Amino acid sequence: MRRLIGGLLTALVLSGCMVGPDYRKPEIAVPSDFRGATPGAAQDASSFGNVEWWKVFQDEQLQALIRIALEQNYDLRVAATRILQARSQVVIARSFQFPTADLAVAAPYDRQTGGNKTPNYENFFPQGGASVAWELDLWGRFRRATEAARADLLATEDFRRTVILTLISDVARTYFTLRELDLEMEISRSTLATRETFLRLTKAREQGGVATLLDVRQAEQLYFSAAATIADLVRSIEQQENLISILVGKYPEAIPRGRPLTEQALVMAPAVPPGLTSDLLARRPDILQAEQQLVSANARIGEAKALLFPSVVISGFAGAGGAVINGSGFGPFGAFQALPTITLPFFNMGRLSANVDFNDARTQEALLRYQQAIQQAFGEVADSLVGVRQRKAVREQNEATVAAQRDALRLSTMRYEGGVTSFLEVLVTERDLFDAELILAQSWRDEILAIVQLYKALGGGWQTVAPLPAPTATSELPPQDVGPSAAEGRTVPGGDSASVHAGRVSVAEERATNGTGAESGSPAAGGGNDTTWGSVKTFFGRLFSK
């Protein structure tokens, strides 16, 4: 007994060891500033990332659509269920660190009557017991697996934040595209009305002998062209509304409008101060996800290395039983068994070593992907900064173009009315104005979308998350602090899941429902005599009185 206790104490001491590398955050050199950041801007980190960035546009309809999307979008709800799955995986991985216990009860009954050559008999052998098994975590295999599962959970949570950030950006992008199409529709209808007036006047001039039939046909061509543009815009607007409806988790329907596009564009993105690269990129969920995937892969190395060492399993059994033979009770009898088992890997054709190499290579891949995610983030921010700056310049140039084109139309109309030029010059100038106005509308949209992309690239607003769906009884888990390898401030489940008993039907209820009555294996089957059943009750009375 002393040797057994001493062995257990030694095993418990050894269980504090863990093979494999501990995670250390990689030191990655990054630029001190974003390319394209505003030189000399004030250090104000609250400009980005700490606010619900879509509210800077001050469009109540857009904000309402985003709120609905955060509640009903299916991609986001799927991501939330994956978090529940990852939480369960943490509980499963952690459970291997502790002993398992099982209870078993058996009551075999055997009865024979009406025998001619063999004597009649009636036997009942009730027995029950508990078995316990515990694989000691001497080398940290199960703790490494738990560490990896917790990192996977955090990566899943970061993936959900990525979905949130992408969803908000997509809703804003599609909404502003819809408002741009509305602006194009407004321009097209105004142009159609103008061309209708041109056509009517041209027909009147042709009837008066001032204009030619060619002038009429050219005016008709411009009129029908504008009408076709309107028909195509109707299609595009409805398709855009359908896309927004799906994003917010609804069936296709009309989308309410808020502020006009030209008023939206009056809201400019604030200057990006230099020196905020570390703070802002540390909040990008895709970078955090890549790091947690690196943490998980690193922990899997230790899990694989632990398989190279001996494993110790301590199992035991304790129980009691008895017998009732032809009405006579015997027992109860007790039983106890302890069985420590040591398993040492001997020959596996290099499988275990290859498993270590495989996980080491996966860790190297995860490190490269982490570095790549950081580099891509810098590229996206730089692209967004130049996009905001140049889209604004393009929009200003297009405004000047439209102003010049309107004046050109005024002058060409005066020249035509004065008989200096042909009607073709007026039509060409008016057509060029229509095209310039459509291009200006698109430049308004592109400038706003560049602002949206900038906020997305800087990870802005992702911390405003939608609530997880209410977990079921099997997945409602108590939180536990994350180990040192996980991100600070986040929690993962560490307790056992609650079991669900609702909906189960007892054997007696099932038999009553099915109307099957007693069977041959039951003590009540076959009309057993009172002596035997009385002995059974006496046996159980003696058993539970011990």
Where are these regions (language model features)?
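Amphipathic alpha-helical coiled-coil segments
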Residues: 78-93, 163, 167-190, 194-199, ...
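Short, solvent-exposed, mixed-charge loop/turn linkers that connect secondary-structure elements
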Residues: 190-193, 210-212, 231-281, 422, ...
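Regulatory alphaC helix of protein kinase catalytic domains
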Residues: 38-68
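Hydrophobic, lipid-facing positions within transmembrane beta-strands of outer-membrane proteins
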Residues: 124-132, 174, 276, 336-342
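C-terminal motif of bacterial Sec signal peptides marking the signal peptidase cleavage site
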Residues: 15-16
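Small/polar (Gly/Ser/Thr/Ala-rich) solvent-exposed segments
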Residues: 77, 97-122, 133-162, 181-182, ...
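Post-signal peptide N-terminal segment of mature Sec-exported envelope proteins
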Residues: 26-44
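Acidic, low-complexity, intrinsically disordered peripheral segments
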Residues: 251-252, 266-268, 438-546
